[in-house]
Amino acid sequence: MARIAGVDLPRDKRVEIALTYIYGIGRPTANVILKKTGINPDTRVKDLTEEEVAKLRDEIEKNYKVEGELRREVALNIKRLIEIGCYRGIRHRKGLPVRGQRTRTNARTRKGPRRTVGVKRKK
């Protein structure tokens, strides 16, 4: 089993698809990596030689931020926004959409389940 950047790539999938299991690598990036290393995207992971796996590993480690390093950078960016108190930081802190979406209706993914506010009747 090919292990790159701490992720076990699925053996039966094509290399192009298998690389997307690594956080920070999508289809376009996977294709660029395969083009640079000269590996056919249609090759199955189980058919890769140790040399090809080493090439992929080197290319990804040298030129791309992936997995833990990328997650840490994203978390630090969000933390910085919160600390400086900018609009986006405030939206992150309140758990609201950050990119200008409407919140009067919708935005349920970001806001979580509804908390119904009831009214009290006079007795």
Curated annotation (Swiss-Prot):
One of its GO terms (molecular function) is tRNA binding. Signal peptide: none annotated. Keywords: Ribonucleoprotein, Ribosomal protein, RNA-binding, rRNA-binding, tRNA-binding. Residues 99-123 are annotated as: Disordered. The keyword Ribonucleoprotein applies. InterPro entries: Rbsml_uS13_C, Ribosomal_uS13, Ribosomal_uS13-like_H2TH, Ribosomal_uS13_bac-type, Ribosomal_uS13_CS. One of its GO terms (biological process) is translation. PROSITE patterns: RIBOSOMAL_S13_1 (PS00646), RIBOSOMAL_S13_2 (PS50159). It comes from the Bacteria. GO terms for cellular component: cytosol; small ribosomal subunit. Belongs to the universal ribosomal protein uS13 family. NCBIfam families: uS13_bact. PANTHER family: 30S RIBOSOMAL PROTEIN S13/40S RIBOSOMAL PROTEIN S18 (PTHR10871), SMALL RIBOSOMAL SUBUNIT PROTEIN US13M (PTHR10871:SF1). HAMAP family: Ribosomal_uS13. Part of the 30S ribosomal subunit. Forms a loose heterodimer with protein S19. Forms two bridges to the 50S subunit in the 70S ribosome. Located at the top of the head of the 30S subunit, it contacts several helices of the 16S rRNA. In the 70S ribosome it contacts the 23S rRNA (bridge B1a) and protein L5 of the 50S subunit (bridge B1b), connecting the 2 subunits; these bridges are implicated in subunit movement. Contacts the tRNAs in the A and P-sites. This is Small ribosomal subunit protein uS13. It comes from Carboxydothermus hydrogenoformans (strain ATCC BAA-161 / DSM 6008 / Z-2901). The gene is rpsM.
